[in-house]
A protein has these predicted regions:
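Active-/binding-site microenvironments in catalytic and ligand-binding cores
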Residues: 1-151
Length: 151
């Protein structure tokens, strides 16, 4: 993963935190993620298409978190300890194989917690501006796709 993809991947965690703040706990389950260069896509389980105002608020909150330049903590923990400490919120809809006994857990305090083995920036400020480019709601699967670029 190169430097720009590290920033874009970190932006996924920032956008996810903003999505949950704006749309609520019903949007907390990530179905898939995609990163290519400065382009990212976050897909979460959700039951409706967000309003334009909600999308604007997600982008605003994400960029506010970038400007706050808060630290990104990565903890490498035995799986049982990670589960005790962070609970189900650190997981996504795609399972981590049971034979994985040590987890890396990425934490942006009061924003996002996620078991993730990718590279991340040390702070949110290193990411740069996040611009939401496209939002697609797939009603039949109840999936919300948010595509963004890191500028």
């Amino acid at each position: 993963m190169n430097e720009i993809e590290t920033k874009t991947h970190t932006a996924l965690h920032i956008v996810k935190g903003a999505v949950v703040k704006v749309l609520g706990e019903k949007a907390k389950w990530t179905a898939s993620v995609y990163v290519s260069g400065n382009h990212g896509r976050l897909t979460v389980k959700f039951d409706r298409k967000p309003t334009p105002e909600e999308i604007a608020e997600i982008e605003r909150l994400a960029n506010e978190k970038v400007k706050e330049n808060v630290p990104i903590h990565v903890y490498e923990l035995p799986r049982e300890e990670a589960e005790r400490r962070f609970g189900e919120d650190m997981y996504d809809l795609f399972p981590i194989p049971p034979e994985i006994k040590t987890l890396k857990v990425v934490v942006i305090e009061n924003w996002n917690v996620n078991a993730c083995n990718k590279q991340h920036t040390k702070t949110t400020g290193e990411v740069g501006e996040i611009k939401i480019k496209k939002v697609r709601f797939r009603k039949s699967k109840e999936l919300l796709e948010i595509s963004f670029d890191v500028l």
